Amino acid sequence: MKTFVLAAATFTLLALSAAAQTAPEVRTVASFHAIEVSNGIELRLASGTAQRVEATADDAEQLARLKTEVRDGVLKITFDRKLNETWTMSKTRHLRVSVTATALTALHASSGSTVEVPGAFTTDKLDVSVSSGATLKAKFTSTDLRAQVSSGGVATVAGNAQRLDVGASSGGVFKGGELLARACDANASSGGTVDVAVQETLTAKASSGGDVRYSGSPKDVTRHTSSGGSVKGR
């Protein structure tokens, strides 16, 4: 009986120790207006009246290597890889950072990172890029929204924009069927795909197998296609 109690107590202590190691860690960082995330890290972004950065990982060692640093107003979220370290996506799938931002002018996701913006984020001007297998799912309300998706990146964006400037290349995909833009410039090249909803004015360029699809019955549509590119309404 004593052996059983001792074993149970030991197990409880180990469990508590593990829980303590993986508890979310609130980071104190300088003020920022832009975010860059990479290395397969999961980012959950929200709008709020006070900025907040919270990091979680599977263990204390990974948490210490999960970096959240502000440089020139940009919050850089990265993982500190060791020299000659063999790297696979499985090693980053449990690296998560939750960010509350008071303002946002740019959001860049790369290298297999995942960005989710579950609530509407309102901003005047926003520059978004998604590349190298990264994914973005967001809802934005913006006066001027610029988005570039490349190298297998996928961006799924809803909301509203007075003006949308979007480009997709090298297999990048921009899914903006639920993002209503008053005016839009869309450019798809090298197998990139752009899907947009436009109210008034659309200028669409497609080349080298790029594909632009649009809805919303825009009043004025200008098309430029070459080298197997396609621009079509749906």
Predicted feature locations:
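Bacterial N-terminal signal peptides
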Residues: A7-A15
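Acidic (Asp/Glu) and glycine-rich low-complexity loops/linkers
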Residues: A19-S110, T114-S129, K139-R146, A158-D165, ...
